[in-house]
Amino acid sequence: MGHSACGCPGSQARVIERTETTEQDNTTKATSELRQWPVQLHLVPPTAPWFQDSDILIAADCVAFALGSFHSDLLKGKAVAIACPKLDDTAPYIEKLAAIFRQNEVKSITVAIMEVPCCRGLDVIVRQALGLSGKEIPLETAIIGVNGERRN
């Protein structure tokens, strides 16, 4: 894999070849599993009611576009916050996430990131926030390939 001018392989332009699929039942539409608004980490308040007694998904922005089954495989039954560790101002994220973890009874945390190196920063941020919170909450990281498959 070549590097772009900025040195980040995640910024490399690429075409993803797909064979055209035909849906068995084109009258059935996927149902959204989103249970809250807003979803951007910058916008969600730490005291939002959907974080209480919840499983939380913290997903990199690109994950929902890369993983076709995002709603059914990752989002279903979870509160969500999305962020981009490369493009967002992430300075407030560690403290904000720590506040979410401290102020709520969180059952589990799933971090969903892309396989590109710059996306790993989101996993690091969440782990630092969890440590800062003083809580012990089960944490899982899901790594999604740029071709749309789960890597782990």
Predicted stretch roles:
Residues 1-152:
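Iron-sulfur-associated redox domains of electron-transfer enzymes in respiratory
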